[in-house]
């Protein structure tokens, strides 16, 4: 028996058993288990929180993607509407320009026709005056007296009425 008591392993085993007994007497195992349980609960809570945050992030991502898609659709609609509006305004401006040009052309043609008519009238008037003057000169040189005066007046009236 002295051989076993002289071995250090024996005394280590005895010290271990005594230490375990003291730990059991003071309830150290309960404290260790309680600490481990608390750690387990804390880790589980952190994992649950991480899962909840992950789901929340996924929901926010889906919402962001939906909003982005909606914004892109709305932007496309606005662009299409702006293009349609620009085309409508361009067509309207073209129609107004064509109408303006047509009215200006008609006005210019009317002024040209009026100027032509005035020029023709002026030429006729000048021709009539020249013919009257020529007839007066010829008649006054060829015919003398009261007869010449009557013929001259009648001739002038006739020429004026025909030329004007």
UniProtKB/Swiss-Prot annotation:
Its main location: membrane. It is a single-pass membrane protein. It comes from the Bacteria. Disulfide bonds: none annotated. It holds the Pfam family ATP-synt_B. GO terms for cellular component: plasma membrane; proton-transporting ATP synthase complex. GO terms for molecular function: proton-transporting ATP synthase activity, rotational mechanism; proton-transporting ATPase activity, rotational mechanism. The chain crosses the membrane at residues 8-28. Keywords: ATP synthesis, Cell inner membrane, Cell membrane, CF(0), Hydrogen ion transport, Ion transport, Membrane, Transmembrane, Transmembrane helix, Transport. It is found in: Cell inner membrane. F(1)F(0) ATP synthase produces ATP from ADP in the presence of a proton or sodium gradient. F-type ATPases consist of two structural domains, F(1) containing the extramembraneous catalytic core and F(0) containing the membrane proton channel, linked together by a central stalk and a peripheral stalk. During catalysis, ATP synthesis in the catalytic domain of F(1) is coupled via a rotary mechanism of the central stalk subunits to proton translocation. PANTHER family: ATP SYNTHASE SUBUNIT B, ATP SYNTHASE SUBUNIT B', CHLOROPLASTIC. Belongs to the ATPase B chain family. F-type ATPases have 2 components, F(1) - the catalytic core - and F(0) - the membrane proton channel. F(1) has five subunits: alpha(3), beta(3), gamma(1), delta(1), epsilon(1). F(0) has three main subunits: a(1), b(2) and c(10-14). The alpha and beta chains form an alternating ring which encloses part of the gamma chain. F(1) is attached to F(0) by a central stalk formed by the gamma and epsilon chains, while a peripheral stalk is formed by the delta and b chains. This is ATP synthase subunit b 1. It comes from Rhodopseudomonas palustris (strain BisB18).
């Amino acid at each position: 028996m002295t051989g076993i008591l002289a071995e250090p392993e024996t005394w280590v085993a005895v010290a271990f058993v005594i230490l375990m007994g003291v730990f059991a007497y003071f309830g150290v195992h309960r404290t260790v288990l309680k600490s481990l349980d608390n750690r387990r609960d804390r880790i589980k809570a952190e994992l649950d929180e991480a899962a909840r945050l992950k789901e929340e992030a996924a929901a926010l991502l889906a919402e962001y993607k939906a909003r982005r898609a909606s914004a892109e659709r709305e932007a496309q609609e606005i662009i299409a509407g702006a293009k349609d509006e620009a085309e409508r305004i361009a067509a309207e401006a073209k129609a107004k320009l064509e109408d303006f040009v047509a009215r200006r052309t008609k006005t210019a043609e009317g002024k040209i026709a009026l100027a032509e008519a005035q020029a023709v009238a002026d030429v006729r008037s000048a021709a009539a005056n020249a013919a009257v003057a020529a007839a007066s000169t010829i008649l006054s040189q060829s015919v003398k007296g009261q007869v010449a005066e009557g013929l001259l007046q009648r001739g002038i009236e006739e020429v004026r009425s025909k030329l004007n």
